[in-house]
């Protein structure tokens, strides 16, 4: 009987502690920063052999800078500036925008890829981080030729 009374006496304090811990854990989970935020823009449709400009805007919510390499991949081989790869230092206060100009005469799926890489001489003082969870981010669009 005495043990049961102790159990009920500790219960409100335990419940309050659990509630505080739960509220603290939820607040910490909501405060996660996005590693890469990307906006890939290409026209939805073009005429055959018309010049296409693809634009990829990249930013981060991390406080630290990262070295990123951006490039495009397509479902069919494309010529020209499509094959350019860009390497840049991406920081919270310095978003980047990349451009590719190319031609196509058939419908194609295009993926814009952002790799977080380890490379010296890109960020000031070589101060950059690499995320542990993932280091490749991509988005795809379809370009129709009509």
From Swiss-Prot:
Signal sequence, renumbered to the chain: 1-28
Disulfide pattern: 65-91, 89-123
Residues listed as glycosylation sites in the UniProt record: 105
Residues that bear Pyrrolidone carboxylic acid: 29
Compartments, as annotated in UniProt: Secreted
GO MF term (any one): aspartic-type endopeptidase activity
InterPro entries: Ig-like_fold (IPR013783), Ig_E-set (IPR014756), PIP (IPR007990)
An example Gene Ontology biological process: proteolysis
Main location: secreted
Keyword Glycosyltransferase: no
Pfam family, one: SVA
A GO CC annotation given for this chain: extracellular space
Claim: Membrane is one of the keywords in the record: no
Keywords noted in UniProt: Disulfide bond, Glycoprotein, Pyrrolidone carboxylic acid, Secreted, Signal
Annotated Gene3D superfamilies: Immunoglobulins
Record's subunit section: Monomer. Interacts with AZGP1.
Family according to the record: Belongs to the PIP family.
Protein name: Prolactin-inducible protein homolog
């Amino acid at each position: 009987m005495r043990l049961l009374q102790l159990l009920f006496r500790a219960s409100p304090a335990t419940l309050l502690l659990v509630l505080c811990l739960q509220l603290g854990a939820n607040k910490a989970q909501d405060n996660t920063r996005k590693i890469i935020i990307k906006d890939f823009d290409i026209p939805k449709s073009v005429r055959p052999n018309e010049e296409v400009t693809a634009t990829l805007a990249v930013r981060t919510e991390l406080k630290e800078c990262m070295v990123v390499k951006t490039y495009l991949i397509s479902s069919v081989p494309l010529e020209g500036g499509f094959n350019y790869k860009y390497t840049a230092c991406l920081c919270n206060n310095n978003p980047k925008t990349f451009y590719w100009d190319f031609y196509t005469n058939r419908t194609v799926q295009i993926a814009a890829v952002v790799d977080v890489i380890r490379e010296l001489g890109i960020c000031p003082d070589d101060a950059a981080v690499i995320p542990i969870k993932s280091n490749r981010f991509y988005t795809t669009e379809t370009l129709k030729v009509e």
